Amino acid sequence: EVMVSYEQTEKVLFSADAFGKFGAVGTDEPWPEEARRYFINIVGKYGAPVQTLLKKAAALDIATICPLHGPVLQGDLTPYLHLYNTWSSYQPETRGVFIAYASIYGNTKAAAGTGSSKSISVQPNGVRRPQL
């Protein structure tokens, strides 16, 4: 079990597992990539409690977020809060379709790529094993 705390003097939210991420400390990797993976694997099934946390946090003046895992978040916290709201409400970040295909002669591959649209991202991906 974990507990979230807020320190008023320094405006620090100690967020427990919320806003955590995988990865090594001191690397310049973008926060969303490993934070998304962390959310899916660690926090994902607790969407409703995260939504409650976000609603309570909206009433606080937060300057810093200190998760149990990952970097301390400072500066403009809006992108982090927005992504956590999206993830915890189980909404897609972008509209899209993933098409998994296997194509011996290339015809299925060609058909998989025909569904592109300006409003929806289509991501065809071959699942054939690479030749050794």
What are these regions (language model features)?
Residues 1-75:
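Metallo-beta-lactamase
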Residues 76-132:
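N-terminal beta1-alpha1-beta2 submodule of the flavodoxin-like/Rossmannoid cofactor-binding fold
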